[in-house]
Regions:
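Short S/T/G/P-rich N-terminal loop/turn motif that feeds into the first structured element of a domain
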Residues: 1-49, 53-68, 76-94
Length: 94
């Protein structure tokens, strides 16, 4: 089942997002298993929405690429961990 993730970074900025994206998305391509990615400024920070082909592919990306890079620090990137909401995707349109 497809799996959705919403990450919110309170106080986050476009510049911080761009730094993180460059560090975790190789050559501007989606990670293996990721079907959709969108991001933008929200009321009090920066929000990222992703859909993976399964919960397992999300966990693999999160545990082996995203969170280790965020924890070690990305120059110019977000300085706090995201607030995370996850869900099983009922409907995804192209």
């Amino acid at each position: 089942m497809k799996y959705g993730i919403v990450h919110h970074f309170p106080g986050g900025t476009k510049a911080q997002y761009d730094a993180v994206l460059k560090a975790v998305h190789v050559k501007d391509k989606l990670p293996e298993g990721q079907l959709f990615h969108a991001a933008g400024q929200s009321a009090d920070g920066w929000t990222v929405i992703a859909v993976h082909d399964s919960k397992e592919s999300w966990e693999r990306f999160r545990d082996t690429i995203l969170m280790p890079r965020l924890k070690q620090g990305i120059s110019g990137g977000f300085t706090t961990p995201p607030q995370e909401t996850t869900f099983e995707v009922h409907n995804l349109k192209p």
